[in-house]
């Protein structure tokens, strides 16, 4: 599942400061993660025109904040920045595994096989519900040096990428939950409200 991911990540090793982030929980992470109900989570992110040091430093701060929250993916809108930038690391426990940094990501193809799997979100802490998504995808993006890349992903990595790309379109995983009763129960339990959910068609 992670072969393609690992190859791409290794190409960035020793090149950039943004991937050199220790996988640890720090007391005061650099970025605040905004929660369900904040308007910034519902805006369309803007493409990044030039990948520069500021972009790489933002990715570095996003990784620090993601690791501190014990997450495996984070999108720039979640930290209040409406830019098309994602950081992903599905191997938090493996200190040698490199994170994946996706700039201006675009999913170019979805596989035909769908599966249901429990998802959570750093912007909706404590809420975990099943979401149906394609099990495989094809993706193109720019890496943190601004170089164009393509990759295939499946399993957890494919799901995580789809989840984070949704954030760039103002979509949250709770919008895709089909069991509204379960959703209402889980949101209420964690202090969130149904009025902040915008259901989308699964067809």
Swiss-Prot record:
SUPFAM superfamilies: Peptide deformylase. It is an enzyme of class 3 (hydrolase). The keyword DNA damage does not apply. Fe cation binds at residues 121, 163, 167. GO terms for molecular function: metal ion binding; peptide deformylase activity. Keywords: Hydrolase, Iron, Metal-binding, Protein biosynthesis. Its cofactor is Fe(2+). InterPro entries: Peptide_deformylase, Peptide_deformylase_sf. It catalyses: N-terminal N-formyl-L-methionyl-[peptide] + H2O = N-terminal L-methionyl-[peptide] + formate. Binds 1 Fe(2+) ion. One of its GO terms (biological process) is co-translational protein modification. Its EC number is 3.5.1.88. The active site is at residue 164. Belongs to the polypeptide deformylase family. Removes the formyl group from the N-terminal Met of newly synthesized proteins. Requires at least a dipeptide for an efficient rate of reaction. N-terminal L-methionine is a prerequisite for activity but the enzyme has broad specificity at other positions. PANTHER family: PEPTIDE DEFORMYLASE (PTHR10458:SF22). This is Peptide deformylase. It comes from Prochlorococcus marinus (strain MIT 9515).
């Amino acid at each position: 599942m992670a072969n393609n991911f690992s190859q791409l990540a290794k190409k960035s090793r020793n090149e950039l400061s943004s991937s050199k982030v220790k996988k640890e929980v720090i007391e005061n992470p650099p970025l605040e993660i905004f929660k369900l109900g904040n308007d910034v989570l519902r805006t369309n992110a803007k493409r990044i025109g030039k990948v520069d040091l500021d972009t790489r430093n933002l990715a570095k701060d996003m990784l620090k904040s993601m690791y501190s929250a014990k997450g495996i993916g984070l999108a720039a809108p979640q930290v209040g920045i409406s830019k098309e930038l994602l950081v992903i690391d599905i191997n938090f426990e493996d200190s040698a595994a490199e994170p994946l940094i996706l700039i201006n990501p675009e999913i170019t193809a979805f596989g035909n096989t769908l599966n249901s799997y429990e998802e959570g979100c750093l912007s909706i802490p404590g809420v975990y519900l099943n979401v149906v998504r394609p099990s495989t995808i094809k993706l193109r993006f720019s890496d943190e040096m601004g170089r164009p890349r393509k990759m295939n992903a499946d399993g957890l990595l494919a799901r995580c990428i789809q989840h984070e790309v949704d954030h760039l379109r103002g979509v949250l995983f709770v919008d895709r939950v089909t069991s509204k009763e379960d959703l209402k129960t889980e949101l209420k339990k964690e202090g969130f409200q149904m009025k902040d959910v915008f259901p989308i068609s699964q067809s």
